[in-house]
Amino acid sequence: MANVVENLGKLERRVTISLPKDAVQKEVDSRIRQLAKNVRMPGFRPGKVPLKMVTQQYSGQVEAEVLSDKVGKEFFDISRSENLRVAGQPSFAPKSDATEGDYAFDATFEVYPEVKLGDVATAEIERTTTTISEAEIDRTLDILRKQRVHFHARGEAGEHGDGGGDTAAKEGDRVTVDFVGKIEGEVFQGGSADDFAFVLGEGRMLPEFEKAATGLKVGESKEFDLAFPEDYHGKDVAGKTAQFTITMKKIEWPHLPEIDAEFAKSLGIEDGDLTKMRAEIKDNLEREAKRRTQAIVKNQVMDALLKISELDVPNALIEQDQERLVAMARQDLEQRGVPNAKDAPIPAAMFKEQAERRVKLGLVLAELVKANELQAKPEQIRAEVDEFAKSYEDPKEVVRWYYSNQQRLAEMEAYVVEANVVDFVLSKAKVTDKEVSFEELASATAQA
């Protein structure tokens, strides 16, 4: 008898599965006999429980297992014989109008869609490029110097003393203060501290607090009002105004290291050569620029492919991906040390839009890769592994680490496939180049 696959919508299908009751009962009887060999019941030795008692106790459970197994197998056979590309898991529901002597179930499921790829030549891509200038190297050196800043008390005697012991605190200084804050005359939790140090201008403190400390000299005090923002992390004081008293105890000025041989050595340049140091910084910036520009271009390519492609997305796959994203979110919370992260009430609905895009993009990429033979070649995978391994002390060990684990290798393969897709689209699409500074590039990718 031919199987009739009903079309319930764009992707939803239904097929009826019939199972002869005598075949089901035969399998149930066989499994119960096997079960009886080991089953335990009070008053009987193992394997000596009467078959009738085993049947009474377990027949319902065994019958459900047999039906589940047979329905699943029958559905698999039907989907294969009818060339059905089933997306996700089917749902089975028993039918009340089954033919006498049969069990009948409706299997409802979705199929993978037909993906209509648009003309890649119509896609428009803006390719971001950047050139590392000497000014960018200088800016990076300034950042590296600030990361190695150390402080000296104003008026300190010695090599770094600045003779400004009576100088008022200004931006960039590290200040040490005592403070007391009150709301309606009462000191609140976290509202007071002694010998509290922070750097003016870093934004660690609220603007009103930094403004009050700026301009004070050692030994001076100041009273001021501070309005906590409505969204302040301390819920007990959010939206309230406190009265603070602050006393300046110490002012230290920032001493940045000179760009010399010792500084170069601190960056890993063994002989302290400044030219080598600048070349090393340039290489690092170029690698980082390449990574960031590739990420921007990849996102543009993926957006363009979605824009020119037509397909319906199976809800079953969206729901599966939503659950994956929920699991990833819980794992992220757990890694951050959030208590009971595994049971965090994260609604899957918040990931629906993201999941739909991911599934849709996955289907489009699969079709594009298949149609244009963009699969990753072994030599491409090895080349990427070798390139990644270069940045480690023992590249051979990193290569071995990759090839010893199929999951890691599969991740690299996926990366290569994406790179093949990007290269393919860029070779066909309308591409315009846009030159930006490294600073603009870093800002753009940070906001993405």
Swiss-Prot record:
Protein name from the UniProt record: Trigger factor
Source organism per UniProt: Paraburkholderia phytofirmans (strain DSM 17436 / LMG 22146 / PsJN) (Burkholderia phytofirmans)
EC number of this enzyme: 5.2.1.8
Annotated domain remarks: Consists of 3 domains; the N-terminus binds the ribosome, the middle domain has PPIase activity, while the C-terminus has intrinsic chaperone activity on its own.
Gene Ontology CC entries for this record: cytoplasm
Record field: catalytic activity: [protein]-peptidylproline (omega=180) = [protein]-peptidylproline (omega=0)
Group of enzyme by EC: isomerase
Keyword field: Cell cycle, Cell division, Chaperone, Cytoplasm, Isomerase, Rotamase
Cross-referenced NCBIfam families: tig (TIGR00115)
